[in-house]
Regions:
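Macrodomain-like recognition of ADP-ribose-binding/processing modules
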Residues: 1-170
Length: 170
């Protein structure tokens, strides 16, 4: 696998809640400390450029090595946070996450990517709607960029998500 996608937080340093089951924590744990070090270095460079309070914007991906993971790269992206209700702006931000990750794959000559369910955990994006947006966005991108990718995987954690993706992809 050329890249796996990490649903990151805006600090881009991984989850700091011990034993937390979010994908961000799992990726940083299994990749090894080198991943957190690379993320920290990249964020230091961005803070030097944009100011000490810089946080990674929603839908803007960042690529790193994957270290101990069975992939070449990790593409970290901050998904939208649903605070009160789902809006069309939040839906567009989620679609932008998928589009921007695929564009980053294209720019870096990566031909396979595994997406996690972006924003459906603690960021509270409704799971079914997130799956619909993910599949629709990826399918449209693949039509617009034929032969750009050899393999796109939707990797799910919950049975609920598996059911949604299976229904949508039929």
């Amino acid at each position: 696998m050329d890249a796996i996608v990490n649903a990151a937080n805006s600090q881009m340093l991984g989850c700091f809640i011990p034993m937390h089951m979010c994908i961000d924590n799992q990726i940083h744990t299994y990749a090894g400390v080198q991943l957190r070090e690379e993320c920290s270095h990249k964020m230091e460079e961005l803070r030097a450029k944009y100011g000490s309070y810089y946080e990674q914007p929603t839908s803007v991906p960042m690529i790193t090595a994957a270290y101990n993971l069975p992939a070449k790269n990790v593409i970290h992206v901050v998904g939208p946070i649903v605070r009160n209700r789902l809006t069309s702006e939040l839906e567009q931000e989620l679609a932008d996450c998928y589009t921007n990750v695929l564009n980053m794959c294209l720019e870096n000559n990566l031909r396979s990517v595994a997406f996690c369910c972006i924003s459906t955990g603690v960021f509270r994006f409704p799971n079914k709607r997130a799956a619909e947006i993910a599949v629709d966005t990826v399918q449209k991108w693949l039509v617009e960029n034929p032969n750009a990718m050899e393999r796109v995987i939707f990797n799910v954690f919950k049975e609920e998500d598996k059911k949604y993706y299976e229904e949508i992809l039929q």
